[in-house]
């Protein structure tokens, strides 16, 4: 898998969720390639229902993968306004194309300016991603 991290995206550093700002309040979410590589092949993906409220740091769904089963943690608070039906039906799309066909959902963020303060973006992405890849390699989570 290509472990690239586009600098125009925002990254939640602990749970490896990426955020794409589509408008002031509409934010597209997905799992970054490092998070996916450490999980292994996704077999099952479930997201909270449309229009449900999600809270930063709380579950917004569940995933089952080759190396782990667990909750998908929300990087922001808001309301789910769109879900990627294709990825829900075929979770392997998340593995194959995490920034494209494998996106997860779009949320309407309550307060992007405040909510995004903990996210990594721009020039900070390169240093963070290199450090994370080294940490994952040292743990044996990726090759």
Write out the residue ranges for each language-model feature.
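Acidic, low-complexity mobile loops and tails
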Residues: 1-56, 101-109, 118-122, 130, ...
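Short, conserved beta-turn/loop elements at beta-strand boundaries and strand-helix junctions
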Residues: 21-24, 83-89, 114
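Short beta-strands and strand-coil junctions in structured, solvent-facing domains, enriched
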Residues: 69, 113-115
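Polar, enzyme-active/binding microenvironments
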Residues: 126
């Amino acid at each position: 898998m290509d472990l690239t991290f586009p600098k125009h995206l925002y990254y939640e550093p602990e749970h490896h969720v990426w955020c794409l700002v589509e408008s002031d309040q509409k934010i597209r979410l997905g799992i970054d390639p490092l998070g996916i590589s450490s999980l292994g092949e996704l077999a099952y993906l479930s997201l909270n229902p449309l229009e449900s409220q999600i809270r930063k740091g709380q579950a917004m769904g569940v995933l089952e993968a080759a190396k782990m089963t667990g909750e998908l943690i929300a990087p922001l608070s808001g309301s789910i306004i769109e879900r990627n039906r294709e990825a829900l039906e075929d979770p392997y799309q998340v593995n194959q194309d995490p920034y494209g066909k494998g996106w997860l959902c779009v949320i309407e963020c309550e307060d992007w300016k405040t909510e995004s303060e903990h996210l990594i973006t721009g020039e900070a992405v390169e240093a963070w991603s290199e450090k994370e890849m080294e940490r994952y390699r040292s743990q044996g989570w990726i090759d």
